[in-house]
Amino acid sequence: MVRDGSNLIVHLAPAPVILRIATLTARVRHDPLPYLAREVALVSYLAGVGAPVMAPSDLVPAGPYVVDGWALSAWQLVEHQPERVPGVRAAFTALDELHAAMRGFPGELPWLNPAVDDFDRALAYALETQLVSATEAADLTGRRDGLLDELRRLAPERQALHGDSFARNAVETARGPVWLDFEDCCSGPPVWDLAILVRRDPEPGLVAEIERRHGRPALDAATALRIVQVEPWFRIHEARLEQGW
């Protein structure tokens, strides 16, 4: 096992193959296969054009599969430094490269899915399991709806996005940061990905560059939407750790 979090990550040693098995995400989403299928399709394209990504496995078909009821996909092992998280500036450069490559992706991806359908699923699960109250759920939904409208008005651009682009979803390699974990990929404005990246490490120079490209109002709206979007997931992760799921 490499990691057990939202998904179980397993190295099929000695083969250079990594399996990503939907565990917590399957519990919340009920059917994780569409997420995994979108991820494999997008990353297959990105690997083909040389973008900085962990590529699908070239030893076994990438899938996704369902094995004994578990949804999973297969990926190439990337030699990296597991103790190092890429710095925000290096990750920003790699994300720019990724966005340039994703503009050519010919497939269809749902608009801002992490904050739309996936938010609804996570919030419904949190409400069903009493991790949020009905009042909290209504408040979060109202805030989400208003911020979606605001971001749609301020940033109408639409292209393929990573969807969950904080620096821990990249690894440090000899070529620099390489991005992985695209199961939240979606379409929308690039400011969504950029806001996620700098929210935890708001380096002034990078924030200024994002404001120059997209405007401060769009960055603020994307940041506020991200904060609302992850709240149900934070509650779910906290419960998992406390209860040992």
Where are these regions (language model features)?
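Protein kinase glycine-rich loop
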Residues: 1-3
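A conserved alpha-helical element in kinase catalytic cores
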Residues: 21-68, 85-97
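A short, glycine/Asx- and small/polar-enriched loop/turn
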Residues: 5-6, 12-15, 66-71, 225
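Active-site acidic catalytic loop and adjacent metal/ATP-binding pocket
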Residues: 6-13, 17-20, 56, 148-194
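A cross-family kinase active-site recognition segment
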Residues: 82-136, 156-158
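ATP/Mg2+ or Mg2+-diphosphate-binding catalytic cores
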Residues: 23, 125-129, 135-136, 230-245
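Active-site activation/catalytic loop segments of kinase-like enzymes and analogous catalytic loops
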Residues: 190-216, 225-243
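Conserved short submotifs of the Hanks-type protein kinase catalytic core
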Residues: 68-80
